[in-house]
Amino acid sequence: MFLTLDTSTLTLSLALVEREAAEPSEPGGGLRTVEHVVVGPPQKQSEILPGVVGELLARHGVKLAELEGLAVGLGPGSFTGLRIGLATVKSLAYAAGLKVAGASSLAALALEGPEDVPLYVLAVARKDDLYLGAYLRRGGTVEALEPETAMSPQEVAARMAAEPRAVALGPALVDYRAALESHGVAAHRLLPGHAFPSAVELSRLVRFPEERSLQALFAMEPHYVRASEPERNPKFPPLPGPAPSARLKED
């Protein structure tokens, strides 16, 4: 049994999942959702996340240390949300001696799309840009067609014009559907729903390492795609000499 969470949007998705298949490495299969918890605004993830995790485990009589591991959506998405989710997973895993695993939040959304057509999964980025992940879904697996990126709505529309079979889905369509249609994307190619990455679908993508590794735990980073605001506009100029080997993620 393991716990999966995604905080890449303002909506927290948290799932307690157990394995049913004899072969745990079976792609996306053999999993049963014990409970899926969804908590949206106005509640703040930084304030509620530890309590929601504790309450979920308590409802099913499961202790944190009894879990196989903890899994988290790595984005791209909200910089603050990603930091909250990953910090929570790292601290809980370190305290309880658990394995950790992560997967793309956009790929989890692609698992909810139709099969055998290019899927452009869209999430809101900063500066009126959109994160775009291009995938092909086959059953319980997804294939990335190219690296995830960020671009303007107009550029997304141009990409869809160049790939007439592609359809778009994802949380960005809540706010940017009209903008994409104004740039020529037909309404039927913008799929409804899919307002946040589901921890249930994310659970089908994660693969835990065979052994727990502190190095892997501390090395896990969110997939920001683009630099966060503090990295683009540092408060202080860089010091002379070689660049530091570690980057600060704090605002």
Regions found by a protein language model. Give the residues of each.
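N-terminal beta-alpha supersecondary unit
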Residues: 1-74
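A glycine- and small-aliphatic-rich helix-loop capping segment at beta-alpha/alpha-beta transitions
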Residues: 19-23, 86-94, 137
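DPxDG-like acidic metal-binding loop motif
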Residues: 69-100
